[in-house]
Regions:
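A glycine- and small-residue-enriched flexible loop/hinge signal that marks low-structured segments
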Residues: 1-299
Length: 299
């Protein structure tokens, strides 16, 4: 539904509801100045046909659509909505999704139609403890089914050291990697100064950046977490020594070096697949060999 509407406007200066009269740059009433989200720059006479054509071409010109020099200093309008609902919390079935050729697949089932996905994460699931473990199970099953993918798992908000160790103990697979704790970052909307969010999105960025700069053989660790301004829980060396044997990868702050990923372990109890980079490197080799030998399938 529209949030602001004005009817029966006219570009003619002789009209009772002329553009410049109804939507002036400086409304006479203070209430209008505060509530009117748009204004007109048009104050001249009745536009000619050439003026209309030029305006239409200007709207279609991508250069004309770029923000001008004063765009950053222009007022910003924040409209607060009340009521409504975000709907029910997505559960494991929603994340798993369904394959549908006509209406389009949903959830993880939609990713099964994209061949070159290598990293999968479900950070929003960590905000709902009641269904989080089931969502991780769905992510685990997806990675196993697609063979060449790894899943990034987030610890839940506010978990203690013992709680995150117990949570990690529910899973044992080299295709999953768990990260702890949650991170603090600036609110991009500007509504709040900071947000505390799951680390999975930042970790996926570290994976992708390391892949591009160094390759999948390089451990996605000792890398700066860009955009992170704090951690929900401070992790020191002694706390990390408690979590390492359980395959929990910690995020830590180092004076002069910033916030960094300080761990690259999988959740596998098999020592041969203990590290993320080793597992991903072998997945890369397996996938490359499979693709390069397709010519021999029917030989």
């Amino acid at each position: 539904e529209p949030i602001f509407a004005v009817a029966d406007l006219s570009p003619s200066p002789q009209a009772a509801r002329h553009l410049a009269a109804v939507l002036p740059m400086q409304p006479a009433r203070r209430a209008d100045r505060l509530a009117q989200p748009v204004a007109t720059l048009y104050t001249g006479g009745e536009p000619s046909a050439d003026d209309v054509i030029d305006a239409i071409f200007a709207l279609a010109d991508t250069v004309a659509l770029l923000p001008g020099a004063g765009a950053l200093s222009s007022p910003r309008w924040l409209i607060r909505l009340q009521g409504g609902s975000d709907g029910p919390v997505p559960g494991a079935a929603d994340y798993t999704g369904e394959s549908d050729e006509l209406a389009g697949s949903t959830g993880l089932a939609a990713l099964e139609e994209i061949e070159d996905v290598a990293i999968v994460a479900t950070p929003a699931a960590a905000a709902h403890p009641a269904s989080h473990a089931q969502v991780v199970q769905a992510l685990w099953a997806h990675c196993r089914r697609m063979r060449y993918r790894v899943g990034i798992v987030d610890a839940e908000q506010g978990m203690s050291l013992n709680e995150v160790r117990t949570f990690a103990g529910q899973f044992s697979d080299s295709l999953l990697a768990l990260y702890y704790p949650w991170v603090v970052t600036a609110d991009p909307s500007g509504v709040r100064p900071e947000l505390t969010v799951p680390p999975g999105g930042f970790i996926a960025g570290v994976y992708a950046g390391t892949d591009v700069r160094r390759g999948v053989h390089k451990a996605p660790a000792n890398e700066v977490l860009i955009g992170v301004t704090g951690l929900e829980t401070d992790i020191n060396r002694f706390r990390q020594e408690l979590l390492n044997p359980n395959g929990v990868n910690c995020l830590r702050f180092f004076p002069g070096r910033g916030y960094r990923v300080w761990g690259a372990r999988t959740l596998s109890d098999d020592p041969e697949w203990r590290y993320v980079n080793v597992r991903r490197y072998f997945l890369f080799l397996e996938r490359s060999i499979e693709k390069s030998t397709q010519w021999a399938v029917f030989e």
